[in-house]
């Protein structure tokens, strides 16, 4: 069974686009960069106007791992609350005596039990939309000496294609999302990833992995006209594009591919 989502509500949400941009930048800050690139950052993120095609494959109960995650988070919050309570008791000795009458004053972790309203969907997600990521970087030329020249470049990542199975679980006012595996798709399996529209086209030569999430993408680079004919600059640009392609795929796999997931908690607004 297929259904539509109100994608326009998401793509017009500037806060969501900015949140994703900041999350990507946080990941890049913890990524070791090669010697030929520095100051790598995401300048802009746009979800685009074309949403994914989603097909519902199965409805089940949520996986135990999601309940375990909620319990672990609740236990951690309870431990932190009790630690804060002990700190405040040390500040006021008179209140300390009253608070040590028994364990009843300690914070207790809430019991997380499955509810009849808990539900999990197995979804087939196909995306060939117009998402756009704009990245800025400084290209470092280390010849004839180290850091001989630094060139600012701007890269655009577009034409992203994916076709995967994922699970979406709703429980305890929280939503969990994780990708399980890629789905065979001739349009993507045969597609060639363009890393330089004016240079050679690089095609994937390895067998399809269990999960790539991103199966195709295009990277375009803008550099000053005075450097476009220099072989060393073009080689560095090609290496940078390949590096971006790799870390972009790695980011999605680490953040979204099972056994990892993203978790949206809607309990914060409750009093």
Curated annotation (Swiss-Prot):
The keyword Iron-sulfur does not apply. Residues 73-108 are annotated as: Disordered. Keywords: Endoplasmic reticulum, Isopeptide bond, Lipid transport, Lipid-binding, Membrane, Mitochondrion, Mitochondrion outer membrane, Transport, Ubl conjugation. It is a peripheral membrane protein. GO terms for cellular component: endoplasmic reticulum membrane; ERMES complex. Component of the ER-mitochondria encounter structure (ERMES) or MDM complex, composed of MMM1, MDM10, MDM12 and MDM34. A MMM1 homodimer associates with one molecule of MDM12 on each side in a pairwise head-to-tail manner, and the SMP-LTD domains of MMM1 and MDM12 generate a continuous hydrophobic tunnel for phospholipid trafficking. Interacts with PUF3. This is Mitochondrial distribution and morphology protein 12. It comes from Saccharomyces cerevisiae (strain RM11-1a). The lineage of its organism: Eukaryota, Fungi, Dikarya, Ascomycota, Saccharomycotina.
């Amino acid at each position: 069974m297929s259904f539509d989502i109100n994608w326009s509500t998401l793509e017009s949400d500037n806060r969501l686009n900015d949140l994703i941009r900041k999350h990507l930048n946080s990941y890049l800050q913890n990524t070791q960069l090669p010697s030929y690139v520095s100051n790598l950052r995401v300048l802009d993120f746009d979800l685009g106007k074309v949403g994914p095609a989603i097909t519902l494959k199965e409805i089940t109960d949520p996986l135990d791992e999601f309940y375990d995650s909620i319990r672990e988070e609740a236990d951690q919050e309870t431990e932190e609350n009790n630690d804060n309570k002990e700190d405040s008791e040390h500040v006021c000795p008179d209140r300390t005596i009253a608070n040590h009458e028994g364990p009843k004053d300690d914070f207790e972790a809430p019991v997380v039990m499955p509810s009849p309203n808990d539900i999990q969907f197995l979804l087939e997600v196909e995306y060939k939309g117009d998402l756009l990521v704009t990245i800025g970087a400084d290209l470092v030329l280390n010849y004839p000496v180290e850091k001989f020249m630094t060139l600012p470049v701007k890269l655009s990542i577009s034409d992203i294609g994916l076709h995967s199975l994922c699970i979406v679980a709703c429980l305890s006012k929280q939503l969990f999302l994780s990708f399980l595996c890629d789905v065979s798709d001739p349009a993507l399996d045969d597609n060639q990833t363009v890393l330089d529209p004016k240079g050679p086209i690089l095609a994937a030569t390895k067998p399809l992995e269990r999960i790539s999430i991103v199966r195709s993408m295009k990277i375009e680079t803008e550099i000053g006209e005075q450097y476009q004919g220099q072989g060393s600059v073009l080689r560095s640009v090609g290496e940078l594009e390949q590096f971006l392609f790799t870390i972009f795929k790695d980011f999605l796999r680490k953040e979204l591919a099972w056994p990892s997931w993203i978790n949206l908690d809607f309990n914060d607004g409750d009093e």
